């Protein structure tokens, strides 16, 4: 068993205009998780985001939605991690993933940023890529020139349902992550 997850980061952009966009699926997951765990987000200026502390049987878990916009997400992650002495390998970052079929989920430790600016900034601020990622598939628009508009728009009703299903499945696996059961959660999340 590895170190359990102590911080869950949902990536997204602040503001009503971004709420239901593909790029905000990390926020979708954290909002649903907070509701299920009866946690309340509070605006924490020193952590550059909305933060909730959840007491779990295996210890406290911090939920954070950076309010810095995607490209500066690492500022919030690093501030909270440093303050509470949370190691990179105890952090889970939940984000949208263009290169995964809509509705599919991938879980991994480390790796590149795949062009995702939120991940790029987190890696730079933590000084390592060795944190966990929960990658929620949103599909690719097919042409690189369309990516920015695609991620900043709302998905179709069909895709929204697939994404919501992947969010709900992911949430069922999170207690395994906070218990440090990474192999088991990987089997669960990667199954159809």
Give the role of each language-model region.
Residues 1-110, 120-134, 141-146, 161-192:
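Nucleotide and nucleotide-moiety/phosphate-recognizing core
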Residues 106-112, 151-154:
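Short glycine-enriched, charge-decorated loop/helix-capping segments at active-site entrances
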Residues 115-118:
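Hydrophobic alpha-helical segments within soluble ligand-binding/sensing domains
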Residues 157-158:
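A hydrophobic, small-residue-rich beta->alpha segment in the mid-to-C-terminal subdomain
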């Amino acid at each position: 068993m590895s170190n359990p997850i102590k911080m869950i980061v949902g990536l997204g952009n602040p503001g009503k205009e971004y709420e239901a966009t593909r790029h905000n699926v990390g926020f979708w997951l954290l909002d649903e998780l907070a509701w299920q765990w009866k946690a309340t987000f509070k605006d924490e200026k020193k952590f550059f985001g909305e933060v909730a502390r959840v007491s779990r049987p295996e210890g406290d878990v911090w939920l954070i939605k950076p309010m810095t916009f995607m490209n500066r997400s690492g500022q919030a992650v690093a501030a909270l991690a440093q303050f509470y002495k949370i190691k990179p390998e105890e952090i889970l970052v939940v984000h949208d993933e263009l290169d995964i079929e809509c509705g599919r989920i991938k879980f991994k430790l480390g790796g590149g940023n795949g062009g995702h600016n939120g991940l790029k900034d987190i890696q730079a601020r933590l000084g390592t890529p060795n944190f966990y990622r929960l990658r929620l598939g949103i599909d690719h628009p097919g042409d690189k020139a369309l990516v920015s508009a695609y991620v900043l728009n709302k998905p179709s009703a069909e895709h929204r349902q697939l994404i919501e299903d992947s969010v709900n499945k992911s949430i069922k696996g999170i207690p395994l992550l906070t218990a440090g059961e990474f192999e088991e959660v990987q089997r669960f999340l990667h199954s159809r």
